């Protein structure tokens, strides 16, 4: 019976193959998106708040968003503060 199924089985249509490949590509792109659209504005807002209290160079603030397991997001904020001035 397996031999009969082998000869009578239909090949996948090229449309189905193309659809599967496209689904794989879309899933990969969703996983590898570099950053969400709101991240630059978030960085700017955080920088403005920090500048209210400490004079820093904008390049000293980095904001990164990391995706883990599809449903977990980690926001990492690194701020390099200037060295404290010596009090006299």
Curated annotation (Swiss-Prot):
The keyword Cell cycle applies. Keywords: Cell cycle, Cell division. The keyword Cell division applies. Signal peptide: none annotated. One of its GO terms (biological process) is regulation of division septum assembly. InterPro entries: MinE, MinE_sf. Gene3D superfamilies: Cell division topological specificity factor MinE. Transmembrane segments: none annotated. Disulfide bonds: none annotated. Belongs to the MinE family. NCBIfam families: minE (TIGR01215), PRK00296.1 (NF001422). Prevents the cell division inhibition by proteins MinC and MinD at internal division sites while permitting inhibition at polar sites. This ensures cell division at the proper site by restricting the formation of a division septum at the midpoint of the long axis of the cell. This is Cell division topological specificity factor. It comes from Citrobacter koseri (strain ATCC BAA-895 / CDC 4225-83 / SGSC4696).
